Amino acid sequence: MKFNLAIAALGLSAAAQAQSVSIITTPVGSFSNSAGAAMAKVLVDKAKLRAVVQAQASTGFEETVSGTADFNVSNSFDATLFATGSGEYEGRGAHKNLRYVGALIPYRVAMHVRADSPFQRIADLKGKRISSEFNTQKTIGRIIAAHLANAGLTYNDVQKVPTPNVVRQADDFMSNKTDTMFFALGSAAIKQANASVGGVRVLEVDTSPEAVKRVQDLLPGAYIMQVSPHPSVEGLSKLTNLVAFDMVMVARAELADDVVYQVAKALYENKAELAATFPPFALFNPKAMAKPLLSVPFHPGALKFFKEAGIAP
């Protein structure tokens, strides 16, 4: 009897362990970290999974494909570059076991300046102090380079201020070491900077076909989105054209289908709960979760749910 009870206990322990999931995000205070926390809460409350958020200084893709972590909250173009071994991942080879779980919300991103700054356009940043390098988060440097390219500039046209990651960049901006700060709208760091420097203001992008193409050359899949002023968004006083790209969730191919199915289902069915924890989820369109991701195939568990929900491509 004791032997049987021991076996049963081991079985229960293994089952409980199988239902634990980890979600890698960018550093605490970043947009994806706040989104990851909201998703973890839904997975705990609605899917009855043991979800833990792991904030990383780097992208966390290596941890995802190796199995150190289960899910990764990223931007669409970075997942594509990692999967194909291109861009910042050149020379590392393709990662063919990266799988797509679904599209979440658009990253609406912008270069922010102080509200009383004389800069009105991105072109006005020529010769100014801008964060660079991003040794532990190369994707941020790429996004800033895309904004500069939109205005016909490169990093060679500005004063480069090295920084390791996006959160340290915000600290430098608040310490007046830089003239502008990149961040996704609605991020905790933007709210902090807004309070710290007496207000921030976003710089609108050029929507001409040539300018948009320069952005997309660096950010595959990016697009222009018009954003209206809203109390939850700092730095906007009028309808403004900004760069956007999708936040996506990815996982490794070997992750159990039933776990991925539960995650996709819980996110699809609980938009209100997600938005209650992280307001930008108000932009989440569950029916667009199956929007294809360039060069990254769907995870079978996610695709199974999307077919059941009638949204599979």
Model-derived segments and spans:
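Sec/Tat signal peptide C-region and signal peptidase I cleavage site
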Residues: 14-18
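An extracytoplasmic/periplasmic, membrane-proximal ligand-sensing/linker region
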Residues: 175-177, 185-202, 207, 214-217, ...
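Ligand-binding clefts/hinges and TM-proximal coupling segments of bilobed small-molecule sensing domains
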Residues: 127-146, 222-283, 290-291
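Pocket-lining segment of extracytoplasmic ligand-binding domains
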Residues: 76-78, 85-89, 117, 154-156, ...
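Sec-dependent signal peptide recognition
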Residues: 1-8
